[in-house]
């Protein structure tokens, strides 16, 4: 790889009543450039990740980054959308920009404003990330409920493991000042159906589902030569982007083949194995997604993801802490951020 992170900024996720999408973009873009010690005039390109899709009325969001400073005027700014991977996709495009030697300094921003719409409207928007020609679920939770059901049918009921994952991530979120929910709910609450923890879809309870959030984050990327002149830098060992079929009918959904391919390629590019990792952050839009990610990354064999959580491997003090941030489960899930 040829790029480094030299600065960042992050808003606390949650229901941000007083902030619209522009406010959040301007805040984190300004903060990231300040943290990096980069002048706006020196930014070569901007990539903005936001799912959009009807959450807010404002379109053409990439141009809103220019509101952060007049010296960003006329900088190329591109809107990137890739469902739940939108923020990562924006960063990937920033890495490509630097690798292609089109510029030395890139500002990447991720943002979403989700709480201004009703639950019914929200569900309709999120369901558009599924294959509507075949998958007519009324919410994205129903899609993952079907995936979780299929996994249980093949490998047995793993509700205990899902509750352990939920409890772990809620506990981790207590240590994260940017997390939307900073409350240690405990295993018993997450395991049992109750008035405050009802079934949402299939075997998934409320504590198995990530949080609807407003939020934004930004990073500044530079090439290595520029980064060496900075106060701090984090070097990219590898970055991979894969895309699988959208229709669930064209893939074995419980095998998580897309994530497995991405993990495999990234390990190969970096020249490492899973045993070399110190921690991992994986996409836990639902607790079953984290369980499947254990298998996709090679931590366990297929159908045995529960071993990782039941043996304590993925806890904060385990051999491979997973979602030490609290994950989407407690940190919140503003899609683009």
Regions found by a protein language model. Give the residues of each.
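Conserved active-site "lid/cap" helical segment
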Residues: 1-84, 93, 151-158, 180-190, ...
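Condensing-enzyme catalytic core mediating Claisen C-C bond formation in acyl metabolism
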Residues: 1-22, 130, 163-165, 198-261, ...
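Short acidic, glycine/serine/threonine-rich loops at helix termini
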Residues: 17-19, 58-60, 92, 117-123, ...
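Electropositive phosphate-/nucleotide-binding environments in soluble metabolic enzymes
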Residues: 18-26, 59, 88, 138-145, ...
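Beta-strand segments within the central parallel beta-sheet cores of soluble alpha/beta enzyme folds
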Residues: 40-50, 76-82, 106-110, 160-167, ...
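Short glycine/threonine-rich loop-to-helix capping motif typified by GTGT followed
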Residues: 53-61, 248-252, 284-307, 318, ...
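Conserved catalytic cysteine-centered active-site region
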Residues: 53-109, 113-143, 182-211, 242-244, ...
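N-terminal leader/propeptide and maturation segments of large enzyme subunits in energy/redox metabolism
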Residues: 138-193
